[in-house]
Amino acid sequence: MTGRILLLNGPNLNMLGLREPEIYGHATLDDVVELVRARAEHHGLEVDAVQSNHEGDLIDALHRARGTHLGCVLNPGGLTHTSVSLLDAVKASELPTVEVHISNPHARESFRHHSYISPVAAAVIAGAGVDGYGFAVDILANNHLQRTASQ
């Protein structure tokens, strides 16, 4: 299989390994990108990784990926709970998107329980630590194989 996936990480995820390690663990963003690239390579896929603390940058990355990528692994960070614009960009991209959260938002403060992204996500992985990113790649690869086999 060949193709590209977009790895998109939102606000504060550049601080992984430093910010609240008791919640998010000690893995860094570089560790996450390496994990995703290794898992994607196993499936014959390439990865374009983007992290931004700015909502518009994430939206632009989704727009650019439309028609060129087979899916998106998205950890929207705090934008999960606030961003209708990011929701609209996920929809406009027409990419199968797996929403990933390192911690389980439902086991945390009540304001974290709502996700604007989940209703349009192909899958949601929460509470699996950084391993959730690898699971997301597996889901996108398997879904792509199923779609191409049925065409």
Curated annotation (Swiss-Prot):
One of its GO terms (biological process) is amino acid biosynthetic process. The record marks 19 as: Transition state stabilizer. This is 3-dehydroquinate dehydratase 1. Keywords: Amino-acid biosynthesis, Aromatic amino acid biosynthesis, Lyase. It catalyses: 3-dehydroquinate = 3-dehydroshikimate + H2O. The active site is at 24 (proton acceptor), 101 (proton donor). Homododecamer. Its EC number is 4.2.1.10. Belongs to the type-II 3-dehydroquinase family. Coiled coil: none annotated. GO terms for molecular function: 3-dehydroquinate dehydratase activity. CDD domains: DHQase_II. Pathway: Metabolic intermediate biosynthesis; chorismate biosynthesis; chorismate from D-erythrose 4-phosphate and phosphoenolpyruvate: step 3/7. HAMAP family: AroQ (MF_00169). Substrate binds at residues 75, 81, 88, 102-103, 112. Pfam families: DHquinase_II. It comes from the Bacteria. Catalyzes a trans-dehydration via an enolate intermediate.
